[in-house]
Amino acid sequence: MSSSSLPTKSSNALLSVNFNQDHSCIAVGTRDGYSITNCEPFGRVYTNNAGPTSLVEMLFCTSLVALVATSDTDPKSNASPRRLQIVNTKRQSVICELLFPTAILGVKLNRRRLVVVLEQEIYIYDISNMKLLHTIETSPNPMAICALSPSSENCFLAYPSPVASPTSPFSNSGASSSAEANTTAGDVLIFDLLSLSVTNVIQAHKTPISALALNATGTLLATASDKGTVIRVFSIPAAQKLHQFRRGSYAARIYSLNFNAVSTLLAVSSDTETVHIFKLSSGAGAGAKGRSSSNGGESPSLNSFDGSSDSSSPPGSTTNATRGGYEAFMGKHKAAKSNGISGTLRRRSMALGRGITGSVGGYLPNSLTEMWEPSRDFAFLKLPSQGVSSVVALSSTTPHVMVVTSEGYFYSYAIDLEHGGECILMKQYSLIDPDLDTTSTARSDTATPSLAD
């Protein structure tokens, strides 16, 4: 579950819910309007009864909020799912409005970019002046699956690749062009929002992507497919596979992935009642900053097959959706593949395939090992209800796992950072009525902070 329409078994009043970028606040959209709630201490910071609000996205803890309303039956109403409002909550003013050709399904913000996700398009804006920088055409993406790095320096956008990568080990090399264009490859495209160019395509899963998350520094990407049994973590932008985790043996729909602030833990929520917390090795963050190496842990990205050593596209600002985009990236790699690996394979086949055997032999054992030895969770928690969608986050100030469900409840669980195991429920509140405390834990009776400019 993200800041989008909520599925079944949800509160009738709740339309959307989402944590902000540093997991310090929760943005809530309801049939009455929207609100901002502080996580610690828990308390409502801001409320506006502006009418049904389907999307609410904060910019960290500032007063800047992006809003999308639901359709209104009143013909005089200005509300439309195609209209985005950027609002200053402190000054009670609308900074700007943007109208799009189809309904807005997702909105992402960091301090440099605004990303608006439609079903088949992504719009990228400079947040300082709201200038449209780039438009990306995508395959149908009704769940608005994408991830934006909170970092201003490593400013990356990840979203499902529009076509299968031609060098994917999971694809059939003899398939037709229509089969090649299907969206079941499970590939993820990494787009640099500063240079406005594709930097890599990660072949993350065999089946379609269901969830993505980038860490706070924009150096790690977590991925899940619609099977939901395996979670993978890659370095960005090098696309080196660093971790593979086993969520469970049975398929589940992944609702949320989130790293903690220092990228040592990854929390995963699904349509089961169990939230899993996986532990990342201490060296993962540092390793993510470098380029991919030729060791056995390297992911099957495009570069690991076509021999290219530099995955970065040349920088440059453009508003052309093709130039610097997926087509340009794939065209470059298809040419490299034709001139590079294909010719190499033909030459090596004349030498009894010795080189081919070496390259394939180096890849297959790693794949088989990954199938047999995925890491299990370090800690877990059980939600009171099963079948509810949820958003999970890890507190940056306390060793707590925070979960918000589509029923409108906020849960805070204590995690043992040394031994792991089952987390302990510490607090439970209602987001619909923040004065309601349904646990025996005493609520902190302190003033809630106000949003800063």
From Swiss-Prot:
Keywords: Autophagy, Endosome, Membrane, Protein transport, Repeat, Transport, Vacuole, WD repeat. Pfam families: PROPPIN (PF21032). SMART domains: WD40. GO terms for cellular component: cytosol; endosome membrane; fungal-type vacuole membrane; phagophore assembly site membrane. WD repeats lie at residues 9-49, 204-244, 249-288. It comes from the Eukaryota. InterPro entries: PROPPIN, WD40/YVTN_repeat-like_dom_sf, WD40_repeat_dom_sf, WD40_rpt. It is a peripheral membrane protein. Residues 284-324 are annotated as: Disordered. GO terms for molecular function: phosphatidylinositol-3,5-bisphosphate binding; phosphatidylinositol-3-phosphate binding; protein-macromolecule adaptor activity. The keyword Membrane applies. A motif (L/FRRG motif) lies at residues 245-249. It is found in: Preautophagosomal structure membrane; Vacuole membrane; Endosome membrane. SUPFAM superfamilies: WD40 repeat-like. Residues 289-320 have a biased composition (Low complexity). The keyword tRNA processing does not apply. GO terms for biological process: autophagy of mitochondrion; glycophagy; nucleophagy; pexophagy; protein localization to phagophore assembly site; protein transport. Its main location: membrane. The N-terminus might form a beta-propeller domain involved in specific binding to phosphatidylinositol 3,5-bisphosphate (PIP2), leading to the association of the protein to the membrane. The L/FRRG motif is essential for the cytoplasm to vacuole transport (Cvt) pathway, for the recruitment of ATG8 and ATG16 to the PAS in nutrient-rich medium, and for its recruitment to and dissociation from the PAS under starvation conditions. Component of the PI(3,5)P2 regulatory complex. Belongs to the WD repeat PROPPIN family. The PI(3,5)P2 regulatory complex regulates both the synthesis and turnover of phosphatidylinositol 3,5-bisphosphate (PtdIns(3,5)P2). Necessary for proper vacuole morphology. Plays an important role in osmotically-induced vacuole fragmentation. Required for cytoplasm to vacuole transport (Cvt) vesicle formation, pexophagy and starvation-induced autophagy. Involved in correct ATG9 trafficking to the pre-autophagosomal structure. Might also be involved in premeiotic DNA replication. This is Autophagy-related protein 18. It comes from Mycosarcoma maydis (Corn smut fungus).
